Amino acid sequence: MYKRQEVGAEGVGLFRTEFFLLSNPSGMPDEEEQTRYYRKLAEGCSPHGVIFRTLDSGGDKLPCEQLRTPEPNPFLGWRGIRVSLSRPELFKQQLRAILRACADTPGCGIMFPMVSGYTEVVTAKHILQECREELERKNIPYARDLKVGIMIEVPSAAIMTDVLAREVDFFSIGTNDLTQYTIAVDRVNNRVANMFRPTHPAVIRIMDMTITAGERENIPTAICGEMAGDITLLPLLIGLGATSMSVGVHLVPIIRYAIRNLDYGQCRDMAQKALQAPNSRAIVDLSTALARKSYPALFE
Protein backbone atom coordinates (compact mmCIF):
# COMPACT_ATOMS: atom_id res chain seq x y z
CA MET A 1 0.00 0.00 0.00
CA TYR A 2 2.73 2.44 0.97
CA LYS A 3 4.84 1.43 -2.00
CA ARG A 4 1.86 2.33 -4.19
CA GLN A 5 1.93 5.87 -2.80
CA GLU A 6 5.68 6.16 -3.28
CA VAL A 7 5.54 5.35 -7.00
CA GLY A 8 2.54 7.60 -7.67
CA ALA A 9 -0.09 4.98 -8.46
CA GLU A 10 -3.63 6.37 -8.52
CA GLY A 11 -5.47 3.84 -6.42
CA VAL A 12 -5.70 0.09 -6.93
CA GLY A 13 -7.26 -0.79 -10.27
CA LEU A 14 -7.74 -4.46 -9.44
CA PHE A 15 -7.64 -6.00 -5.99
CA ARG A 16 -7.90 -9.78 -6.22
CA THR A 17 -9.95 -10.68 -3.16
CA GLU A 18 -9.27 -14.40 -3.63
CA PHE A 19 -5.66 -13.80 -2.57
CA PHE A 20 -7.00 -12.84 0.84
CA LEU A 21 -9.02 -16.06 0.90
CA LEU A 22 -5.95 -18.16 0.09
CA SER A 23 -4.51 -17.24 3.46
CA ASN A 24 -7.51 -18.90 5.08
CA PRO A 25 -7.33 -22.56 3.94
CA SER A 26 -9.87 -23.66 6.54
CA GLY A 27 -12.65 -21.57 5.07
CA MET A 28 -13.86 -18.19 3.91
CA PRO A 29 -13.28 -15.37 6.42
CA ASP A 30 -16.50 -14.12 8.00
CA GLU A 31 -18.08 -10.79 7.16
CA GLU A 32 -16.45 -8.92 10.03
CA GLU A 33 -12.96 -10.11 9.17
CA GLN A 34 -13.46 -9.27 5.51
CA THR A 35 -14.80 -5.83 6.38
CA ARG A 36 -11.77 -5.00 8.52
CA TYR A 37 -9.37 -6.17 5.83
CA TYR A 38 -11.08 -4.34 2.97
CA ARG A 39 -11.52 -1.16 5.03
CA LYS A 40 -7.83 -0.98 5.85
CA LEU A 41 -7.02 -1.25 2.15
CA ALA A 42 -9.64 1.31 1.09
CA GLU A 43 -8.54 3.83 3.70
CA GLY A 44 -4.90 3.36 2.74
CA CYS A 45 -5.67 4.18 -0.89
CA SER A 46 -7.93 7.16 -0.23
CA PRO A 47 -8.80 9.41 -2.04
CA HIS A 48 -8.13 7.40 -5.21
CA GLY A 49 -10.05 4.30 -4.27
CA VAL A 50 -9.83 0.56 -4.83
CA ILE A 51 -11.60 -1.70 -7.31
CA PHE A 52 -12.48 -4.88 -5.44
CA ARG A 53 -12.89 -7.86 -7.73
CA THR A 54 -15.20 -10.39 -6.15
CA LEU A 55 -14.06 -13.96 -5.65
CA ASP A 56 -12.42 -15.30 -8.82
CA SER A 57 -11.92 -18.84 -7.63
CA GLY A 58 -11.20 -21.65 -10.08
CA GLY A 59 -9.06 -22.10 -13.18
CA ASP A 60 -5.49 -21.31 -12.25
CA LYS A 61 -6.41 -20.14 -8.73
CA LEU A 62 -6.54 -22.43 -5.71
CA PRO A 63 -9.80 -21.96 -3.81
CA CYS A 64 -10.26 -22.36 -0.10
CA GLU A 65 -11.51 -25.67 1.27
CA GLN A 66 -15.15 -24.56 1.12
CA LEU A 67 -14.92 -24.14 -2.64
CA ARG A 68 -12.56 -26.93 -3.59
CA THR A 69 -14.20 -29.09 -6.26
CA PRO A 70 -12.29 -31.32 -8.72
CA GLU A 71 -13.01 -30.44 -12.34
CA PRO A 72 -11.75 -31.99 -15.59
CA ASN A 73 -11.40 -28.54 -17.23
CA PRO A 74 -11.38 -25.81 -14.57
CA PHE A 75 -10.77 -22.97 -17.04
CA LEU A 76 -14.14 -23.69 -18.66
CA GLY A 77 -15.90 -24.71 -15.49
CA TRP A 78 -17.01 -23.40 -12.13
CA ARG A 79 -15.14 -20.15 -11.66
CA GLY A 80 -15.53 -16.41 -11.25
CA ILE A 81 -19.06 -15.06 -10.98
CA ARG A 82 -20.40 -18.59 -11.53
CA VAL A 83 -19.08 -19.63 -8.13
CA SER A 84 -20.51 -16.54 -6.42
CA LEU A 85 -23.97 -16.89 -7.93
CA SER A 86 -24.15 -20.55 -6.97
CA ARG A 87 -23.16 -19.72 -3.38
CA PRO A 88 -25.36 -16.66 -2.71
CA GLU A 89 -24.76 -16.57 1.05
CA LEU A 90 -20.98 -16.49 0.64
CA PHE A 91 -21.44 -13.93 -2.15
CA LYS A 92 -23.64 -11.71 0.01
CA GLN A 93 -21.15 -11.95 2.85
CA GLN A 94 -18.43 -10.58 0.61
CA LEU A 95 -20.63 -7.89 -0.95
CA ARG A 96 -21.78 -6.61 2.44
CA ALA A 97 -18.18 -6.53 3.64
CA ILE A 98 -17.10 -4.44 0.65
CA LEU A 99 -20.07 -2.09 0.99
CA ARG A 100 -19.31 -1.55 4.67
CA ALA A 101 -15.57 -1.20 4.17
CA CYS A 102 -16.01 1.59 1.63
CA ALA A 103 -18.59 3.58 3.59
CA ASP A 104 -16.20 6.47 4.24
CA THR A 105 -13.86 6.15 1.25
CA PRO A 106 -15.24 7.54 -2.02
CA GLY A 107 -13.97 6.37 -5.38
CA CYS A 108 -14.11 2.64 -4.68
CA GLY A 109 -15.76 0.08 -6.89
CA ILE A 110 -16.72 -3.55 -7.14
CA MET A 111 -16.09 -5.75 -10.16
CA PHE A 112 -17.57 -9.09 -11.16
CA PRO A 113 -15.19 -11.55 -12.90
CA MET A 114 -15.73 -14.15 -15.62
CA VAL A 115 -19.03 -12.66 -16.76
CA SER A 116 -20.37 -14.35 -19.88
CA GLY A 117 -23.61 -12.48 -20.45
CA TYR A 118 -26.45 -10.19 -19.42
CA THR A 119 -28.26 -12.47 -16.98
CA GLU A 120 -25.21 -12.89 -14.74
CA VAL A 121 -24.75 -9.13 -14.54
CA VAL A 122 -28.33 -8.27 -13.62
CA THR A 123 -28.49 -11.17 -11.15
CA ALA A 124 -25.29 -10.04 -9.42
CA LYS A 125 -26.57 -6.45 -9.32
CA HIS A 126 -29.85 -7.64 -7.82
CA ILE A 127 -28.00 -9.48 -5.06
CA LEU A 128 -25.87 -6.38 -4.45
CA GLN A 129 -29.04 -4.32 -4.08
CA GLU A 130 -30.40 -6.84 -1.58
CA CYS A 131 -27.22 -6.37 0.44
CA ARG A 132 -27.69 -2.60 0.40
CA GLU A 133 -31.25 -2.99 1.64
CA GLU A 134 -30.17 -5.37 4.41
CA LEU A 135 -27.58 -2.89 5.65
CA GLU A 136 -30.08 -0.04 5.38
CA ARG A 137 -32.61 -1.89 7.54
CA LYS A 138 -29.95 -2.51 10.18
CA ASN A 139 -28.73 1.12 10.06
CA ILE A 140 -25.23 -0.05 9.19
CA PRO A 141 -23.20 2.54 7.23
CA TYR A 142 -22.29 1.48 3.71
CA ALA A 143 -21.00 2.95 0.45
CA ARG A 144 -23.95 4.44 -1.40
CA ASP A 145 -21.98 5.47 -4.46
CA LEU A 146 -20.01 2.27 -5.03
CA LYS A 147 -19.23 1.87 -8.73
CA VAL A 148 -20.11 -1.47 -10.32
CA GLY A 149 -18.09 -2.94 -13.16
CA ILE A 150 -17.38 -6.21 -14.91
CA MET A 151 -14.37 -8.02 -16.28
CA ILE A 152 -14.48 -8.55 -20.03
CA GLU A 153 -12.52 -11.75 -20.49
CA VAL A 154 -14.99 -14.03 -22.27
CA PRO A 155 -15.81 -13.39 -25.96
CA SER A 156 -19.56 -13.80 -25.36
CA ALA A 157 -19.45 -10.88 -22.91
CA ALA A 158 -17.40 -8.77 -25.31
CA ILE A 159 -19.94 -9.34 -28.09
CA MET A 160 -22.67 -8.16 -25.69
CA THR A 161 -20.85 -5.06 -24.45
CA ASP A 162 -23.28 -2.72 -26.22
CA VAL A 163 -25.98 -4.11 -23.91
CA LEU A 164 -23.80 -4.63 -20.84
CA ALA A 165 -22.49 -1.05 -20.99
CA ARG A 166 -25.95 0.16 -20.01
CA GLU A 167 -25.86 -1.96 -16.85
CA VAL A 168 -22.47 -1.07 -15.35
CA ASP A 169 -20.23 1.88 -14.54
CA PHE A 170 -17.02 0.57 -16.08
CA PHE A 171 -15.36 -2.27 -17.98
CA SER A 172 -12.02 -3.89 -17.29
CA ILE A 173 -10.54 -6.06 -20.02
CA GLY A 174 -8.71 -9.09 -18.66
CA THR A 175 -6.28 -9.59 -21.51
CA ASN A 176 -4.84 -12.91 -20.32
CA ASP A 177 -8.12 -14.81 -20.17
CA LEU A 178 -9.61 -12.93 -23.13
CA THR A 179 -6.70 -14.08 -25.27
CA GLN A 180 -6.96 -17.64 -24.02
CA TYR A 181 -10.68 -17.92 -24.68
CA THR A 182 -10.66 -16.07 -27.99
CA ILE A 183 -8.00 -18.14 -29.72
CA ALA A 184 -8.57 -21.37 -27.75
CA VAL A 185 -5.03 -21.60 -26.39
CA ASP A 186 -4.12 -22.79 -22.91
CA ARG A 187 -1.35 -20.42 -21.88
CA VAL A 188 0.11 -22.94 -19.41
CA ASN A 189 0.25 -25.77 -21.95
CA ASN A 190 3.81 -25.91 -23.30
CA ARG A 191 2.65 -27.51 -26.55
CA VAL A 192 0.61 -24.48 -27.58
CA ALA A 193 1.92 -21.68 -25.33
CA ASN A 194 3.78 -20.17 -28.29
CA MET A 195 0.39 -19.45 -29.88
CA PHE A 196 -0.74 -17.36 -26.91
CA ARG A 197 -0.62 -13.84 -28.34
CA PRO A 198 -2.65 -10.97 -26.90
CA THR A 199 -1.94 -9.13 -30.15
CA HIS A 200 -3.82 -11.67 -32.26
CA PRO A 201 -6.00 -9.56 -34.62
CA ALA A 202 -9.18 -11.15 -33.25
CA VAL A 203 -8.25 -10.18 -29.69
CA ILE A 204 -7.47 -6.60 -30.71
CA ARG A 205 -10.77 -6.30 -32.55
CA ILE A 206 -12.67 -7.61 -29.53
CA MET A 207 -10.88 -5.07 -27.33
CA ASP A 208 -11.81 -2.30 -29.76
CA MET A 209 -15.43 -3.49 -29.75
CA THR A 210 -15.50 -3.37 -25.96
CA ILE A 211 -13.90 0.05 -25.61
CA THR A 212 -16.15 1.52 -28.31
CA ALA A 213 -19.27 0.15 -26.60
CA GLY A 214 -18.11 1.76 -23.37
CA GLU A 215 -17.47 5.10 -25.05
CA ARG A 216 -21.01 5.15 -26.45
CA GLU A 217 -22.38 4.92 -22.91
CA ASN A 218 -19.68 7.20 -21.43
CA ILE A 219 -18.12 4.51 -19.27
CA PRO A 220 -14.35 3.93 -18.99
CA THR A 221 -12.46 0.78 -19.91
CA ALA A 222 -9.36 -0.31 -18.01
CA ILE A 223 -6.81 -2.87 -19.16
CA CYS A 224 -5.60 -5.67 -16.87
CA GLY A 225 -3.15 -8.48 -17.47
CA GLU A 226 0.41 -8.67 -18.73
CA MET A 227 -0.45 -6.63 -21.82
CA ALA A 228 -1.13 -3.53 -19.68
CA GLY A 229 2.47 -3.44 -18.51
CA ASP A 230 4.11 -3.93 -21.91
CA ILE A 231 5.62 -0.62 -23.03
CA THR A 232 5.78 -1.79 -26.64
CA LEU A 233 1.99 -2.23 -26.70
CA LEU A 234 1.07 0.86 -24.71
CA PRO A 235 0.60 3.04 -27.84
CA LEU A 236 -1.87 0.48 -29.17
CA LEU A 237 -3.89 0.38 -25.95
CA ILE A 238 -3.99 4.17 -25.70
CA GLY A 239 -4.93 4.40 -29.36
CA LEU A 240 -7.82 1.99 -28.89
CA GLY A 241 -9.15 4.28 -26.17
CA ALA A 242 -8.26 2.50 -22.94
CA THR A 243 -8.63 4.90 -20.02
CA SER A 244 -6.40 3.25 -17.41
CA MET A 245 -3.91 0.43 -16.90
CA SER A 246 -3.80 -1.95 -13.95
CA VAL A 247 -0.18 -2.97 -13.52
CA GLY A 248 2.17 -4.19 -10.81
CA VAL A 249 3.51 -1.51 -8.48
CA HIS A 250 7.04 -1.86 -9.87
CA LEU A 251 5.78 -0.91 -13.36
CA VAL A 252 3.86 2.22 -12.38
CA PRO A 253 6.71 4.77 -12.85
CA ILE A 254 7.62 3.30 -16.24
CA ILE A 255 4.04 3.25 -17.53
CA ARG A 256 3.38 6.79 -16.28
CA TYR A 257 6.53 8.05 -17.99
CA ALA A 258 5.62 6.30 -21.23
CA ILE A 259 2.05 7.64 -21.29
CA ARG A 260 3.26 11.21 -20.70
CA ASN A 261 5.41 10.92 -23.80
CA LEU A 262 2.73 9.58 -26.13
CA ASP A 263 0.74 11.68 -28.58
CA TYR A 264 -2.88 10.52 -28.54
CA GLY A 265 -3.50 11.46 -32.16
CA GLN A 266 -0.56 9.38 -33.33
CA CYS A 267 -1.69 6.47 -31.14
CA ARG A 268 -5.20 6.68 -32.55
CA ASP A 269 -3.99 6.68 -36.15
CA MET A 270 -1.68 3.75 -35.49
CA ALA A 271 -4.45 1.77 -33.75
CA GLN A 272 -6.71 2.17 -36.76
CA LYS A 273 -3.99 0.67 -38.94
CA ALA A 274 -3.49 -2.13 -36.42
CA LEU A 275 -7.18 -3.02 -36.61
CA GLN A 276 -6.69 -3.76 -40.31
CA ALA A 277 -3.49 -5.77 -39.82
CA PRO A 278 -3.65 -9.45 -40.85
CA ASN A 279 -1.49 -10.92 -38.10
CA SER A 280 0.03 -10.41 -34.68
CA ARG A 281 3.49 -9.56 -35.99
CA ALA A 282 2.20 -6.61 -38.01
CA ILE A 283 0.32 -5.24 -35.00
CA VAL A 284 3.34 -5.57 -32.72
CA ASP A 285 5.57 -3.85 -35.28
CA LEU A 286 3.21 -0.89 -35.63
CA SER A 287 2.91 -0.33 -31.88
CA THR A 288 6.59 -0.93 -31.15
CA ALA A 289 7.67 1.57 -33.80
CA LEU A 290 5.60 4.32 -32.19
CA ALA A 291 6.76 3.31 -28.72
CA ARG A 292 10.42 3.56 -29.71
CA LYS A 293 9.80 6.93 -31.31
CA SER A 294 7.89 8.28 -28.30
CA TYR A 295 10.12 7.13 -25.42
CA PRO A 296 13.46 5.92 -26.81
CA ALA A 297 15.11 6.11 -23.38
CA LEU A 298 13.09 3.10 -22.22
CA PHE A 299 14.65 0.96 -24.96
CA GLU A 300 18.27 1.80 -24.20
Which residues are covered by each model-predicted region?
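Conserved alpha/beta-domain cores
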Residues: 3-300
